[in-house]
A protein has these predicted regions:
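4′-phosphopantetheine-dependent carrier domains
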Residues: 1-184, 189-193, 210-473, 477, ...
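C-terminal catalytic ATP-binding subdomain
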Residues: 196-197
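Short loop/beta submotifs within extracellular cysteine-rich repeat domains
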Residues: 262, 479-484, 488
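Disordered, acidic interdomain junction associated with two-component signaling
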Residues: 200-209, 223-227, 485-489
C-alpha cells in the first residue's frame, strides 16, 4: 500500500480475518460514529452580561455549619462558602473538606432565613478550566461532585465557582458577573469566565489527520496504536477484578488486547462468587498467569504490598481501577461516615495507586469514574464526590507527563456491577434524563476508544439526543453540561415535563383555577398531582395512582420524594419544602395543600359567585344599542328573550325594552348568545 505521493507505507504477507459479533460492530459505530457515545468536557468562554454584573454589595460568609444560624440574623439573599484544600489530595484531607461543605450545605438548605437566597460554593484550582490543565486542588474537585448532587436535588439554589489557581483574590469581585450569567457552574481564569460543556470526543482518525497535516503521519500511526498497548510480558492490575465490571474488563484485556499476565484484586479474592471459574476462562482465552487476591485497596500498606508482589519478570505495566461501592442518599441524609464508606475504594484506593506506581513504567493508568460527578445525580452526593476526585487524579497525572485517563461512565445495563440495584423507578428517572444503558460489548468499545484518545477525562455515556432535543424545544430544563449538544439547550431553565399541567407557571395554574368552583379546583389539582406522581414512578398514566394511596405505599423513597417536590415546584412556582411528601402523605392531601397555596383566599367562580356576572352586566349596560345592532346580535338577543319561559312575549321592542331584556340574561345565556348557540 502507498500514500498519496506513491511512497510505500505498508507491506503485507498475509491478512487474517476473524468473526466480529453484531454487538461489537455496534459498539465500534457508537464510539466513533456521528451518534457516538464518547464525550469530553470543554470549558466554553461565557460572555459577561452587560446588565447585572455589578459587584455584589453584601453577602454572608459561611465557613462551617455553625455559621448558618449566625448568618441568618440579617436574612441575606446571598451566602458564600469558600472550600479550599491544601493541594495534596490526601484522602483524609479530601474527606475533611467535603464533610465540612456537606455540613454547611445541609444547614443552609433547611434554614428558613435562606429559603429565598442563593449559596455560592467557591473552590480554587479544582477544575481544569483551560483544557487538560493540572488540577491543583483534588479535594476541591470532590467538593464539586458533592455540590453538583445538591444542585440536582435543589434546582436554582446553589452555584459553583472555581477561582484561578494563579490568583489570590477572593470570590467577592466575581460574584456579580458569575451570578449574572445564570450558569450553575463557572470558572474564573484571569478576567474570563467559562462553563463546562460536553462535546464529542475526537476520534483517533481526527488525531491522525491533524498529525498528517504536520507531516508526522507515520509517527502518529505508531503512537496512537501503541500508546495504550498492554505489553504481553507485563502484568495488568484490575481492581474490583471479580465484580461485574472487573470481570468484563479482564476478559476484554486477555481476548482483545493480548494481556497474558493479569492480577485481579477484590475484597474477597478467590472466595468471590465465580472467581475460580473466571481464572479458568481467562486461561482458555490465552492468559498465561491469572492471580486473584483479596486486598483492601483503601489501605496504603496493603496496596504497597500488593504492588510489590508483582514479579520483576512480568512487571506491572497497566492499572485499571473498577472498584467502588454505593451508599445512596439525598444530601440531607448523608453523614461524614457515609462519605468515608464510599470514599474508601475510590478516593483512598486511587490515591494510593497513583502514588505507589509513579516511578513505574506504566502504559495504562485507567480509572472507572462516573458521570454523576459531572452532570450531578440526585441522591448520589457521596458517590459523585468520590468520582470527581478520580477525574482530578487523571488530570494531575497527565499534567505530570504520566499515563492517566478517567472514564466517567454513564448508565450500564442493569446486570452490570454498581447499577444492578436499580429498579424500574430509577431506570425511568434515568430515561427521562435522556440517559440510556450501555451494553457490555458497547462499553468495551468505548473503553478502547477512551484509551486511544489523549484526553485525561472522557465521558462514555449513551445519550438519547432525540429526547434531549425534544425537551429543549419544549422549554424543559437541561443541565448546562449537556445543553451544548442540543440546539437551544445551552442553559438550564426551570421547567418540567409530564402530564396534568406540567410545565405551566404558578400564575398559569392559578388562572386556570380561578374560573372553577372549589370542587372543580380540587379535582384539577388532584389530577395535576397524580400526573406528576405517575411520571416520577414511571407509570404510563395516572390510572395507577390512587387519590388516597399513601406515597410510601406507592413506592416513594427520599429520592423520588425530592424529585416530585422539584417537579411540583417547577410547575407551580411555589416554595415547597423537601418534606412536602411526608407532610401531605397522599395525592389528595398534597392537592389540597397546593390548593391553599395557589388560591390562598379560596376564590372560586361559577354559579355560586356572581361578582363576575355583575361586572359583565355593568359592561353590557354601558354599551349603546347600536353596538349590538352593528355586531348582528340584536335580533338574537330579542329572540332569546322572547323564548324565556318566565317572561311573556314582548312583541315589538324599543331600545328601553332591549336594554331591559339584555339585563335580565344570565351569564350562561349571554355566552351562548355570543357563540351563536340558540
Amino acid at each position: 500500500a502507498a500514500d498519496e505521493t506513491g511512497e510505500p507505507v505498508l507491506t503485507m504477507d498475509s491478512l487474517v480475518f476473524r468473526e466480529v459479533s453484531a454487538d461489537r460492530l455496534g459498539a465500534a459505530a457508537g464510539a466513533g460514529g456521528d451518534d457516538g457515545s464518547l464525550f469530553r468536557v470543554e470549558w466554553a468562554e461565557l460572555p459577561v452580561p452587560a446588565v447585572g454584573s455589578e459587584p455584589v454589595a453584601s453577602w454572608v460568609a459561611l465557613a462551617g455549619a455553625e455559621d448558618v444560624a449566625a448568618g441568618a440574623v440579617d436574612a441575606p439573599d446571598l451566602a458564600v462558602l469558600e472550600a479550599y484544600g491544601d493541594g495534596t489530595g490526601d484522602g483524609d484531607e479530601v474527606l475533611a473538606l467535603t464533610a465540612r461543605v456537606l455540613g454547611v450545605v445541609q444547614a443552609w438548605l433547611v434554614a428558613p432565613a435562606f429559603e429565598n437566597g442563593k449559596l455560592v460554593v467557591v473552590t480554587r484550582g479544582a477544575m481544569p478550566a483551560t483544557g487538560d490543565a493540572d488540577v491543583t486542588d483534588p479535594a476541591g474537585a470532590a467538593v464539586w461532585g458533592l455540590v453538583r448532587a445538591a444542585q440536582a436535588e435543589n434546582p436554582d439554589r446553589i452555584v459553583l465557582v472555581d477561582l484561578d489557581p494563579a490568583g489570590s483574590a477572593g470570590a467577592g469581585p466575581v460574584l456579580g458577573p458569575v451570578l449574572a450569567t445564570g450558569e450553575p457552574l463557572a470558572a474564573v481564569r484571569g478576567t474570563a469566565l467559562s462553563a463546562p460543556r460536553l462535546v464529542r470526543a475526537a476520534a483517533v482518525e481526527t488525531e491522525r489527520a491533524a498529525a498528517a497535516a504536520a507531516d508526522v503521519a507515520a509517527e502518529s500511526r505508531t503512537k496512537t496504536e501503541s500508546a495504550y498497548a498492554f505489553a504481553p510480558g507485563g502484568t495488568v492490575l484490575v481492581t474490583g477484578g471479580t465484580g461485574s465490571l472487573g470481570t468484563l474488563v479482564a476478559r476484554h484485556l486477555v481476548a482483545e488486547h493480548g494481556a497474558r499476565h493479569v492480577l485481579l484484586v477484590s475484597r474477597r479474592g478467590l472466595e468471590a462468587e465465580g472467581a475460580r471459574e473466571l481464572v479458568a476462562e481467562l486461561g482458555e482465552l490465552g492468559a498465561e498467569s491469572v492471580v486473584v487476591t483479596a486486598c483492601d485497596v483503601a489501605d496504603r500498606a496493603a496496596v504497597a504490598e500488593l504492588v510489590g508482589s508483582v514479579s520483576a519478570q512480568h512487571p506491572l505495566t497497566g492499572v485499571v481501577h473498577t472498584a467502588g461501592v454505593l451508599d445512596d442518599g439525598v444530601i440531607g441524609a448523608l453523614t461524614p461516615e457515609r462519605l468515608a464508606y464510599v470514599f474508601g475504594p475510590k478516593v483512598a484506593a486511587v490515591g494510593h495507586l497513583d502514588e505507589l506506581t509513579r516511578d513505574m513504567d506504566l502504559s495504562v493508568f485507567a480509572v472507572f469514574s462516573s458521570a454523576s460527578g459531572l452532570i450531578g445525580s440526585a441522591g448520589q452526593g457521596n458517590y459523585a464526590a468520590a468520582n470527581a476526585y478520580l477525574d482530578a487524579v487523571a488530570h494531575r497525572r497527565r499534567a505530570a507527563g504520566l499515563p492517566g485517563v478517567s472514564m466517567a461512565w454513564g448508565l450500564w445495563e442493569q446486570s452490570a456491577g454498581l447499577t444492578a440495584h436499580l429498579g424500574a423507578v430509577d431506570q425511568a428517572r434515568m430515561s427521562r434524563g435522556g440517559i440510556l444503558p450501555i451494553a457490555p460489548a458497547e462499553g468495551m468499545g468505548l473503553f478502547d476508544a477512551a484509551l486511544r484518545g489523549s484526553a485525561a477525562l472522557v465521558v462514555p455515556i449513551k445519550l438519547d439526543l432525540r429526547r434531549l432535543r425534544a425537551d429543549a424545544a419544549a422549554g424543559r430544563g437541561l443541565p448546562g453540561l449537556v445543553g451544548g449538544l442540543v440546539q437551544g439547550g445551552r442553559r438550564q431553565v426551570r421547567a418540567v415535563d409530564g402530564q396534568a399541567g406540567a410545565g405551566e407557571s404558578g400564575g398559569g395554574l392559578a388562572a386556570r383555577l380561578a374560573g372553577l368552583t372549589a370542587q372543580e379546583q380540587e379535582a384539577l389539582l388532584l389530577d395535576f398531582v397524580r400526573g406528576h406522581v405517575a411520571v416520577v414512578l414511571g407509570h404510563a398514566g395516572m390510572a395507577k395512582v390512587g387519590a388516597e394511596t399513601a406515597f410510601k405505599d406507592a413506592g416513594f423513597d427520599s429520592l423520588t420524594s425530592v424529585e416530585l417536590r422539584n417537579r411540583l415546584r417547577g410547575a407551580t412556582g411555589l416554595k415547597l419544602a423537601a418534606t412536602v411528601v411526608f407532610d401531605y402523605p397522599n395525592p389528595l392531601a398534597l392537592a389540597r395543600h397546593l390548593h391553599r397555596e395557589v388560591i390562598p383566599d379560596g376564590v372560586t367562580a361559577g354559579p355560586d359567585v356572581d361578582v363576575d356576572e355583575a361586572r359583565l352586566r355593568r359592561g353590557l349596560a354601558s354599551l349603546p344599542l347600536a353596538r349590538f345592532r352593528a355586531a348582528g346580535l340584536l335580533d338574537a338577543l330579542v329572540r332569546l328573550v322572547e323564548l324565556d319561559d318566565h317572561e311573556p312575549p314582548i312583541g315589538t321592542v324599543d331600545d328601553a325594552d332591549d336594554e331591559t331584556a339584555i339585563a335580565d340574561l344570565n351569564v350562561d345565556d349571554l355566552v351562548q348568545l355570543a357563540l351563536g348557540d340558540k
